[in-house]
Every structure is written in C-alpha cells, then in structure tokens.
C-alpha cells in the first residue's frame, strides 16, 4: 500500500512529467502547458490565502520532509493543490491529445492522489472536490486561450 500512497503523493509531479513528455514536440502546447501550470499553482496559493480554510487536524505524513511543509499558506487546505494540479494536467492533456489511453492512465494517477490526500487526512472531501474543479476550469481556460491567441505551431 505504501507504493500506491507514494504514487498518490507524487501524482501531480508524475502528471507534469507525462505532460512534458507528451507535448514536447508541440511547442505552443508545451510552452502553454508549462506556463499555465505555474499560473494554476499561483491561483491555488491565492485561493488558499483568500479562503483560509484549515486542513483537517492530525494529518499523517507519507514522507519525512512533509513535517515542515504545512506552514504559512500551506497550513490551509482549500482548495487542494494536489487535486487542482492533477486535474489541470488531465484536462489540458485530454483537450490537446484527445487520447483515451492517456486519459485512463492520468485518471488512475489522479485517483490515487485524491485517495492519498483524503486517507492521510490532509484534505477534506470538499477541499479535494473544489481543487479538482478549479483544476478542470484552469486546464480548459488554458487550452482555450492558447487556441485563440497562439496560432503558430
């Protein structure tokens, strides 16, 4: 079970790497993906600062370095950054590639991420759902903006 939890913990990073690999030869989508991934992260931090909803009490750590990372803005759990980043990647990659095989793999990794964050008491179900929805919206908006304003490949 530890390997599944570890995959869940690193799910957003795994999905980011998958996106970079898949989009490497499609420059406008590659650069857009990386740029908007950063914007998605910034949106998450701004929402956490604005909403200020704390994480659940007594969250468990999967990695030793986790003990000190839930301070400052990271003490807040709304919306879940893991869920938001995962669903940003899923949405962006699906809209660009429309490949059901990639979608299934990405959804599997994102499901492990959602499960890990919930089972380790790092987020409530509401924080995970809102994070997922924000990620979908940012992913969709990113591809829409790129398709509208960046016409060269």
What are these regions (language model features)?
Residues 82-86, 123-147:
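Alpha-helical transmembrane segments that form the membrane-embedded catalytic/substrate-binding core
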Residues 98, 105-106, 144, 149-151:
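Short, charged/polar low-complexity linear motifs in solvent-exposed/disordered segments
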Residues 1-78, 84-119:
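Hydrophobic alpha-helical bundle signature of multipass membrane enzymes
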């Amino acid at each position: 079970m530890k390997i599944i939890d570890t995959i869940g913990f690193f799910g957003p990073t795994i999905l980011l790497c998958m996106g970079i690999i898949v989009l490497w030869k499609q420059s406008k989508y590659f650069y857009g993906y990386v740029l908007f991934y950063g914007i998605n992260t910034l949106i998450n931090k701004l929402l956490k600062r604005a909403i200020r909803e704390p994480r659940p009490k007594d969250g468990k750590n999967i990695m030793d370095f986790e003990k000190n990372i839930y301070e400052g803005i990271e003490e807040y759990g709304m919306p879940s950054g893991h869920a938001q980043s995962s669903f940003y990647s899923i949405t962006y990659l699906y809209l660009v590639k429309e490949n059901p095989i990639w979608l299934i793999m990405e959804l599997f990794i994102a499901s492990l991420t959602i499960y890990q964050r919930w089972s380790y008491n790092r987020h409530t179900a509401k924080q995970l759902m809102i994070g997922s929805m924000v990620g979908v919206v940012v992913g969709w908006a990113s591809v829409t903006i790129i398709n509208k304003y960046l016409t060269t490949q």
